Amino acid sequence: MTSLMRKLSRELWQLRGQMLSIALVVATGIMTVVTMRGSYETLVDAQQAYYRDMRFADVWASVKRAPEPLRREIEAMPGVAAVDTRVSFYATLDLEGLDAPAQGHFISLPEHGRPTVNDIRLRSGRYIAPGTSDEVILSENFAHERGLRPGNSIRAVINGRARDLDIVGVAISPEYTYAVPPGSLYPDDKRFGILWMSREVLGPAYDMDGAFNEVMLRLSPDANEDAVIARLDGLLDRYGGLGAYPRAEQPSHLILQGELDQNRVMGTAIPAVFLGVAAFLLNLVLGRLIRTQRGEIAVLKAFGYRDREVGLHYLLFALAAPVLAGADELD
């Protein structure tokens, strides 16, 4: 062992308390990086898998009233991989314990089969039975907040008529991970819920038999999203199209993506604080050590040690804490 290495070992032992403290701060920063980055990547993977399994739409468009045969023209558009149409309306819900009426967003489901775009996942209960007129599936967040479950009933005013509806299932959907009421910026699960109902029942109730007022598209990987939206707007314009928009502007996705982005930013900012504190402490310790050893440095240089060798000695001292922290994380 060289003289400088013996000197380094002696200094590290003498300052073991400070160096161990710095190593713990660095280890905390590294652990935070690994944990939060892993959490972010896991959440993103889960989001993408959920979107893929539920066939989450890439483009939405609302229209006043369009004939169902128009669907074939939309399917023939370049870049479109799948199309689904539906009937969608808002209605007042008669619920106890509220000082103002609650609102429900009624969305049609095919009576036979499942939606080709924006499917739902049952959490409890069953799917709507064919031929029934008063069965609904409730969004999970709303059902939880209102204490509703399959077997309960709920009263709604649908197109001016009060109807008692039987809750047969509770479901989730990527489209309504966060259900945001119209005119609001944030979800309100106590006053606003999603209710899925048979299209054969909901359509005639709003004079939408053989027609639709909402269309969702999934795009092929090589599709030009802007071009598809422009062409879709052109097709729907004569039927009172209200403007198509991409997934990036879909309210629930926008909120969820914002939370994921916040998670990613925090995964960078918090570790940076720990590592910054560690760097500050290490700078204090190293600076004090160099100031107190000016005489020793002069002696070393007098004995023929070059500036590079002396500098390497103090660099190894500075690296001791991060190396110790890294070794601790590997263990």
Segments the model singles out, each with a brief description of its role:
Residues 151, 304, 329:
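Conserved G/P- and acidic residue-centered "switch" motifs that form tight phosphate/ATP-binding loops
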Residues 13, 20, 301-320:
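Amphipathic cytosolic juxtamembrane alpha-helices at the membrane-cytosol interface
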Residues 276-298, 319-331:
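Small-residue-rich transmembrane alpha-helices
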Residues 1-276, 307-308:
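Membrane transport/envelope proteins' first extracytoplasmic loop
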Residues 18, 22, 267-270, 317, ...:
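Hydrophobic alpha-helical transmembrane segments in multi-pass membrane proteins
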